[in-house]
Design a protein with these regions (language model features):
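Coiled-coil termination/hinge junctions
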Residues: 437-463, 540-543, 550
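Basic, polar low-complexity surface loops/patches
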Residues: 1-278, 283-292, 310, 314-317
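Short, charged/polar, low-complexity loop and linker segments
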Residues: 139, 145, 313-323, 342-347, ...
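ATPase nucleotide-binding head domains, primarily ABC-like/P-loop NTPase cores
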Residues: 2, 35-38, 498, 550, ...
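Amphipathic heptad-repeat alpha-helical coiled-coil/stalk segments that mediate oligomerization
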Residues: 258, 269-274, 287-289, 363-437, ...
Length: 894
């Protein structure tokens, strides 16, 4: 097959220049895809595929109009594709095309998207366990980098930033645990040379200045390599994109609460266990009016701060806004629909901001004095809210607003108005005046021709094929003057042109072209001016987002009757009338208290299934996190410590789907908690050891409790069905028991009240009944449970014996579990039989005659004696297990 030529050949040549998955090449008024790209795009976006011939071969072709490209590209990027865009431009020889930008999941800039879009790089150290990490959000200009100690820490950071695109370094591309856990990110293999530390360090200093690396402590080679690779990748995606990145920050300033992926999932901060966004903490408190505000609220909830000053500053602002309803509502009204200024600044720096984007920037800048006026003469005029509004340089913001106000038309979408305001550019004003005069001449031409030549049904119009023309109705078509030249005959009319009309048309086209050229040049100048102010606009964007977020938290606090928490200085945690923030929004909720301090730091929570243990523990964790996010909390009163991390162990649904056993996942999560938690952490354990044998489970839970109590000393809430663990409160000074109360006078009623002390029952059979387990099964379970409690023998009912009974045979034989003997023995449904009577007689005959009885083994006798003397309540399960194992070995050896 011959190589394609023409447009197809040019497309194939450009495609070889890029590592992007797809190429969109401009061909006039359309962007076209050819070959496999066309088939892929048509399949993903439901486009029609046609064929393009080249050198005797046919190639699939699909296209989208130039004006509609961006939404199509965003749709492809959301599906994980990287899309290169080749624009067309004029040359002396005709048309030429070159790739101007590459849009990938980590570099797409959509002002309407509320979520952060981080691009990440992961570099594994060659001489250690550490990793270098870098995260950049090109939509807002945020850039952070640093080193972490190991794969676990790297995974935690990846889950914290949740990147949409990941660049693994040369040593992190195969079977790397950190990269493997970035499940939702598109993995892009960037060129290896971009990770070279020397080149990366040079690139970073050029971008951020000589001292930037030292200022953030970016001295580890792996971290430098990761940051440099991100910057290099962003540079390859489009000219000017990196201009929005004006600051390099540390990966972790050390003031964020540690929340690993397991905890975020278990607490359902932004996504439920089922993967939904409704029913989460974020969806409950998100009353924001802007995309930037929603994004900031998400950041505060998923990465709360440990900085007491910052927490109190947010609490002060929320308190002020909650108490000033009218002013708060006015602020939210003004903010409603405000554009994402930081992202618009990023679009300006990469040259993609259009007139509408620039007008949106102007509108946002114009909001600043309106917002200030809204709080003037109110309780908000002096205090934390006023401080937030004062963050941007007001003089610089006003100056930029005035420039944009004088430069841009009120409505750039109005085709008759243009995009540049009258009076901004003298030459453009002259061109517009001449153009309007020419258009006026054309508009009046039909009336003039009617009067001059006595014609009826005369119109003047224009299309792409014929240009400007005079259309005369059929009844007057034969009466037109001689200088009319006919160009087309229609069913009821004819079209004509004249020399004068053709001259006017050329003048109009020249003026239109000149107007478009001047407006394009002026828009570019305005865009460059906005790009120069990127840092100012990022500050304005943060200000509007913060004000929106604080107002949203205040709105929810006022609506849900939340209270301001007090920060304790002695690590005391006291909640009165605490509630679950999500559950209380959908159903009537029973509030509960919680008290923990240095003398009461470990609570063992017992109670029936479905009684509310898990909800109680989660609500406690969420109350602490809400406080450190800067929010009020769902309680009557709350005094809370500042924690450095929240760790949870609840379930293993995701990992089970990946083929990892429940118990293995449980132990890995427990291991992470035991290694990571500190005395300033909050730990929530909802069952430990349930994925293995009972004794093993109790032993692990017991040992973990001792370790958390004695070594870690973290505040811990531990829900368990192992009632043996409740005895730890008698041996470990800071362990206390609480339980969820149940009333069982007439059936079982879950009271949802948490009270001091342990519970003695789990009511599992009742829960089975509530779940719809068949009645016979529930009844039999009750019967078995009663016998177990009375330490009576349990008869195991069989099916085959029942068939024999129906045939007229003897009573069915049953297997009976003798609790005292610890084994199954033969028995019958009725509890007696002839064989049984004979056996009893034989036993009676032998009673008292032990001449043939075997002698009791001395070692066995010693074991029995020791067993009788052992106080099982005075030793731990681990010690008891060890002793039982020793007894078994002694009997086996005797």
């Amino acid at each position: 097959m011959s190589a394609p030529s023409g447009i197809v050949g040019e497309f194939m040549s450009l495609k070889r220049e890029t590592a992007a998955d797809l190429l969109a090449m401009q061909c006039g008024d359309f962007y076209e895809f050819f070959g496999e790209d066309a088939e892929t795009v048509a399949d993903e976006l439901d486009l029609k595929v046609s064929q393009k011939s080249s050198h005797g071969s046919s190639y699939p072709m699909a296209g989208v109009p130039v004006d509609d490209l961006e939404p199509y590209v965003r749709s492809l990027v959301e599906r994980g594709y990287r899309v290169a865009v080749a624009d067309q431009y004029e040359t002396a020889g005709g048309h030429a095309r070159e790739i101007q930008r590459v849009v990938s999941p980590g570099t797409v800039i959509d002002p309407d998207d509320a979520a952060a879009r981080y691009l990440a790089a992961v570099v594994r150290e060659t001489d250690g366990d550490g990793y270098g990490l870098a995260f950049a959000d090109v939509t807002t200009g945020r850039f952070r980098a640093g080193r972490v100690a190991d794969a676990t820490a790297a995974t935690a950071q990846l889950h914290r930033f949740d990147p949409v695109e990941l660049l693994p370094g040369p040593d992190a591309r195969t079977d790397d645990p950190a990269v493997d856990r970035a499940d939702d990110a598109t993995v892009t293999l960037h060129e290896t040379t971009a990770f070279a530390p020397g080149r990366a360090r040079h690139r970073l200093r050029e971008q951020f200045g000589e001292t930037a690396l030292d200022a953030v402590g970016l001295d580890a080679e792996a971290a430098v390599a990761a940051a440099g690779a991100v910057l290099a990748y962003v540079e390859t995606t489009g000219v000017g994109v990196t201009a929005s990145m004006t600051r390099l920050g540390p990966l972790d300033a050390g003031d964020r609460v540690t929340l690993d992926a397991t905890t975020r999932r278990n607490l359902e901060l932004v996504e439920t266990m089922q993967g939904d966004t409704d029913g989460t903490l974020l969806s409950t408190v998100d009353h924001t009016e802007t995309a930037a505000g929603s994004r900031l609220l998400r950041e505060w909830l998923t990465a709360p701060t440990q900085d007491r000053t910052e927490i109190r500053r947010r609490h002060d602002a929320v308190e002020a806004l909650a108490g000033a309803a009218l002013a708060r509502d006015r602020l939210r009204e003004l903010l409603s629909g405000t554009a994402d200024v930081a992202r618009l600044a990023a679009r300006a720096t990469n040259g993609s901001a259009g007139p509408r984007d620039l007008v949106a920037v102007r509108t946002a800048l114009g909001l600043l004095p309106e917002l200030a006026a809204a709080v003037a003469d109110t309780p908000l005029s002096d205090g934390p809210v006023a401080d937030v509004l004062a963050q941007p340089d007001q003089s610089a913001a006003r100056e930029l607003y005035e420039e944009l106000e004088s430069a841009l038309a009120a409505d750039p979408d109005d085709p008759g108005e243009g995009v540049i305001a009258p009076g901004y550019d003298e030459e453009l004003d002259g061109v517009v005046d001449d153009y309007e005069a020419a258009r006026e001449w054309l508009d009046e031409l039909a009336d003039r021709e009617k009067r001059r030549h006595g014609l009826s049904h005369v119109t003047v119009d224009r299309n792409k094929t014929d240009g400007y023309y005079v259309q005369v109705g059929k009844s007057s078509a034969d009466d037109v003057p001689e200088h009319y030249r006919e160009i087309k005959t229609l069913k009821n009319s004819k079209r004509f042109v004249t020399d004068e009309l053709a001259e006017r048309e050329r003048e109009v086209l020249r003026l239109e072209e000149r107007r478009e050229q001047l407006e394009s040049e002026l828009v570019t100048e305005v865009r460059e001016r906005v790009a120069e102010a990127a840092e100012l606009l990022q500050t304005v964007g943060r200000t509007l987002a913060e004000l929106d977020t604080l107002a949203a938290l205040a709105t929810h606090a006022a609506q849900a009757d939340w209270v301001r928490p007090t920060l304790s200085d002695d690590r005391r945690l006291a909640v009165e009338g605490g509630r679950h923030p999500v559950v209380e929004a959908t159903t009537e909720f029973v509030p509960n208290d919680l008290r923990m301090d240095d003398d009461r730091s470990f609570l063992i929570v017992t109670g029936p299934n479905m009684s509310g243990k898990s909800t109680y523990m989660r609500q406690c964790a969420l109350i602490v996190l809400l406080s450190q996010a800067g929010s009020f909390v769902p309680a009557d009163a709350a005094t809370l410590p500042v924690v450095d991390g929240v760790y949870t162990r609840v379930g293993a649904l995701d990992e089970l789907a990946q083929g990892r056993s429940t118990f293995m996942v449980e132990m890995q999560e427990l291991s992470n908690i035991l290694h990571s938690a500190t005395a300033d952490s909050l730990v929530v354990l909802d069952e430990v050891g349930r994925g293995t044998a009972t004794y093993d489970g109790i032993s692990i839970a017991w040992a973990a409790t001792e370790y958390l109590h004695n070594e870690v000393r973290a505040k811990t809430l531990f829900a368990t069905h192992y009632h043996e663990l409740t005895t730890l409160a008698d041996h470990l000074p800071r362990v206390h028991n609480v339980h969820v109360a149940v009333a069982d006078d007439d059936g079982v009623t879950f009271l949802r009240r948490v009270r001091d002390g342990p519970t003695d029952r789990s009511y599992g059979v009742h829960v089975a009944d509530l779940a719809g387990v068949p009645g016979p099964v529930v009844d039999r379970a009750d019967e078995v449970l009663d016998r177990l409690r009375a330490e009576e023998a349990i008869e195991a009912r069989g099916g085959e014996a029942g068939d024999a009974s129906e045939a007229g045979d003897s009573e069915p034989t049953q297997a009976v579990f003798d609790l005292s003997a610890g084994e199954f023995t033969g028995g019958s449904e009725g509890g007696s039989s002839d064989d049984g009577a004979d056996g009893a007689d034989e036993a009676a005959a032998d009673d008292g005659d032990d001449s043939d009885a075997p002698a009791v083994d001395p070692e066995t006798e010693a074991v029995v004696s020791e067993l009788q003397e052992t106080d099982v309540t005075a030793v731990s399960p681990l010690e008891l297990m060890s002793q039982v194992q020793e007894w078994q070995e002694r009997i086996d050896d005797s």
